[in-house]
Amino acid sequence: MLVDIVPIGDLPAQVKREASAALRGVYECDVTVHEEQSIPDGAFDHSRSQYRAEQFIELASRIGSGEKNIGITAEDLYYRRRNYVFGLAYLNGNGSVISTYRLQTSSDGGLKSKSPDAVFADRIRKEVVHEIGHTFGLEHCDNSKCVMSFSPTVREVDVKEENLCGSCNRLLY
């Protein structure tokens, strides 16, 4: 299985490294990093000052060379009526996206004594694993520690672990 990371807009090398390592570690897949892509034309919603997540997924699906593809951007994304999303994927699809925009808050809610850079890296890793999980057909999990649990805020992202719980792992394998 090949997962292609598609950087959309300017993205630090650290973000690409963390995403790649997490995907290889959890899914035991091959990972490539595509050349950087421009932000999709027409993706910006001026009334919200945010970008439409679906257009980033479409770009990752079209440009990516993997069986699964994940766009990663530093831009602020939204989907339908949600104020924002950390990421988005379609169940069993081949494209997905995460945004680092709202993952960069410095606090981890006092859960761990990690540096802001380490907290940010953990969040990137969890969100790419989560969104690629959806492309493999995994839905949201009720186990708050599972990487597939729904995370409306960074607090929930910080609570969950980077790995699939036993139930989700059995569904996948």
From Swiss-Prot:
HAMAP family recorded: Archaemetzincin (MF_01842)
TM ranges: none
EC numbers, comma separated: 3.4.-.-
Signal sequence region: none
Cofactor: Zn(2+)
Binding site for Zn(2+) 1: 130, 134, 140
Source organism superkingdom: Archaea
Biological source species: Haloquadratum walsbyi (strain DSM 16790 / HBSQ001)
Name of this protein: Archaemetzincin
UniProt xrefs under NCBIfam families: archmetzin
Family as reported in the entry's similarity comment: Belongs to the peptidase M54 family.
Top enzyme category: hydrolase
